[in-house]
Amino acid sequence: MIRMDGIYKKYLSIIFDPAFYINRNRLNLPSELLENGVIRSEINNLIINKYDLNCDIEPLSGVTAMFVANWNLLPAVAYFIGSQESRLINHSEMVISYYGGKISKQGEAAIRSGFWHLIAWKENISVGIYERINLLFNPIALEGNYTPVERNLSRLNEGMQYAKRHFTGIQTSCL
């Protein structure tokens, strides 16, 4: 479990350093550019301006802290939740996509459905976190009409447990 001061530090990193986690299908840059602090700062400013991201620092609710603690795992959480909805769980497809492979149309639909479950928490998470969730995902996986869904805390917890169990330490590249 991450202590609250660790969560707050990670929250600030998410708000001000989107270059660290933005899906590489949204911004494809050589990693060497991100190693230079001055260039990385400019890239972060460009991302924040391009997506008109809110940079206000807000108090962290319990749900916001959950999202922050599991930030890099949210695409896997979305896949799990969407797969549960469609009764499709293909663990190997998720692993392949994490390593940069192609994901099927069914997999994209599962990710999209799970993404809708994540953004259903809009009223319970900080604006800055809400605005940045989609940056974790491949834009192709999010194409389609939005379908509102109800928040489901037990499903969110299950998805986070699944992601922690199977995908901790892996960076997303295809989702």
Curated annotation (Swiss-Prot):
InterPro entries: T3SS_OrgA/MxiK
Keywords attached to this entry: Plasmid, Virulence
Gene name of the record: mxiK
The organism of origin for this protein: Shigella flexneri
Role noted for this protein: Necessary for the secretion of IPA invasins.
Family matches, as Pfam families: OrgA_MxiK
Name listed for the protein in its UniProt record: Protein MxiK
